[in-house]
Amino acid sequence: MSSTDKEISASEHFDNSISASTVDQVSELGPAGLSGAQVALLALILGGLLGIAGLTSLCLMVWFSHQRFGVDRSAKHGISVKDTSRMGGVAIALFLVIVWLGTAVYPALSGETKPDISWGPSFLVPAALLACVGFLDDLGVPLTPVTRLLITTLILTVGFFLVPAWMPNQLFELIGGTSLGFEVGLLIVSVFTCVGFINAGNMADGANGLFSGICLAFFVSAWFLTTDNFYFTISLGLLSFFLINVLTGRIIMGDFGAYGLSALIALVGFDIFDQGLVGLGFLATLLSYPCVEIIRIFLVRIGKGESPFRADNQHSHNLLNEYFSNLVKSKTLANSLTGVSIAAFSVMPAVVILFQKGQLNEMLCGLVFGVQCLVFVLVHTVTNAFKSKHQDAFTR
């Protein structure tokens, strides 16, 4: 989660009364982690759905949920209601490493006949480097927004310069030029798109199941289109995390996962677009919420003369969470309802389009994306009005 999602809402004003000394005392303890009953239930679900892969990912996330490092304190965040582990992204990465080692030793696991240590796309390298930038914040070594921006821009610029194939080169055909100026422009557009989506994904990691649900739909779609085992494996890890995150709220993606997965989504998007498997409109539809929300935030803040990196609690998922919190007693349930509902509306139209083989129909996808934009703006307007009315009633 970015600092933008870490402000305390008015409806949870009581947390403001927690003194700094109290927070320091609490920080010496680890998070509560998953209980025995939760682990047993999840073992039945994940074991039944995913077999040994589900149980492996569950073991990793249970272990991380009990560790003292990388903890997100509920006393410091508006949407979080309990101390949670920020190591969800790390657990998914370790799951991928375990699967990679397993298939290298036993190639039959992946349907191969001989060992092969190469696995996954080459742009895993820059995605991993970008994930490490976010990992510093997970460990309590935060970087300033400007420093993060400079580091991510540098990593992507160097990567695209060294390996131009990582960029969406099919844009040359759309634009109709291959000169040096076009190549420089493509580099700038590629870096800007990746940096923008990394920030969008980091912002969206603010409600249970929101970002992970979008990631899951994206990589399932990528696997459906390419039949690449890597995308299938990462989908398994994401499905395990999604269920654990939504049902318990005890572990979140963290900046390692948000940065790494956002970068990977952007780079995979470039790749499948270059292969002619999807259109730009389909990608916009599939990733609609983080893209629309980050653009809305920047436009609103710049229009007000404020820094676009300033932390506040005016994201649509924060406002919708406050609305659900007034409907249900369980704060974890309200959090999960927020994330799952937004993620479902963001990805389901694209999934339906994909199954109908319309992912190259730019007019259809553009129309659907336009409707999604209108709905997201409407939801933000309604929930913001509800928050203002609720605050007025509270202050009387």
Model regions: which residues?
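N-terminal acidic, proline/glycine-rich, low-complexity intrinsically disordered segments
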Residues: 1-15
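"…together with the soluble PPM/PP2C metallo-phosphatase catalytic core" -> "…together
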Residues: 14, 19, 23-292
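Cytosolic, membrane-interface loops and tails of multi-pass inner-membrane proteins
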Residues: 60-85, 295-333
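Membrane-interface starts of transmembrane alpha-helices
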Residues: 83, 144-147, 181-182, 254, ...
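Alpha-helical transmembrane segments and their membrane-interface junctions
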Residues: 95-104, 337-358
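Alpha-helical transmembrane segments and their immediate juxtamembrane interface regions
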Residues: 126-141, 358-396
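Structural signal for the N-terminal portions of transmembrane helices
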Residues: 276-286, 350-351, 361-368
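Membrane-helix cytosolic exit motif
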Residues: 292-304, 378-387
